Amino acid sequence: VYKRQGEVLAENLQGALPAITLEGHPALFTAYMNDCDPLLCFAQQVNGLGKQGDVLFGISTSGTSKNVLYAAVTAKSKGMKVVGLTGAKDSKLSALADTCIQVPETETYMVQELHLPVYHCLCLMLEEKFFG
């Protein structure tokens, strides 16, 4: 019935992994923050969406961002793995994470600049691993 569309899809769709950004839902943020503790917004999403075997990728320049830490604790309680991306200092997130990539800077703007190539590299590595 949809032969042509099927051919277009088969020729053009790329492989994908299920991934959800916890900060990409403005309506949810607004509604949740009006009625609940704003620091728990990420944790609430992990609680609703996460399941054992999933991975939470938590980014915090200091490793002490409460909203990220609450999400990480929630993830661990659900049997999820936690990967952290932080600055150089040991932190609550680096201690809680199963794996933590710590870039060798402590100033926020420098940590953020060093995070860019790290997560681009991680994306490339995942693409290679899963889609060759």
Question: How should these model regions be labeled?
Answer:
Residues 62-66:
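Beta-rich strand-turn-strand
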Residues 23, 60, 86, 101-109:
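Short beta->alpha connector loops at strand-helix junctions that form conserved
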Residues 7-58:
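Glycine-rich oxoanion-binding loops at beta->alpha junctions
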Residues 56, 82, 100-102:
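Short, well-ordered beta-strand core segments
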